[in-house]
């Protein structure tokens, strides 16, 4: 089953180590909405939990995180969203 663009954004941030609170701040959505998106991703991918969902999505879309980094000029140190 295909993920929505917002679900892809959420699972990408989960894969990058963002907490639910950080995802909400970054995407300007509530904590509850973040949880809803994560729950939908887990169901769609038939995963056991969020970590398993990331692993499944990474397996299906092998270049997914690399493309995200290239498109957004991210580095591993660029995630200080709560310190703004």
List PLM regions with ranges.
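Intrinsically disordered, low-complexity Ser/Thr- and Pro-rich stretches
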Residues: 16, 28-31, 68-75
């Amino acid at each position: 089953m295909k993920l929505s663009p917002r679900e892809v954004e959420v699972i990408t941030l989960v894969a990058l180590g963002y907490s639910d609170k950080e995802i909400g701040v970054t995407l300007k959505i509530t904590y509850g909405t973040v949880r809803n998106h994560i729950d939908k991703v887990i169901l769609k991918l038939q995963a056991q939990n969020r970590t398993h969902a990331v692993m499944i999505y990474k397996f299906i879309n092998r270049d997914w995180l690399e493309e995200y980094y290239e498109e957004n000029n991210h580095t591993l140190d660029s995630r200080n969203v709560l310190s703004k």
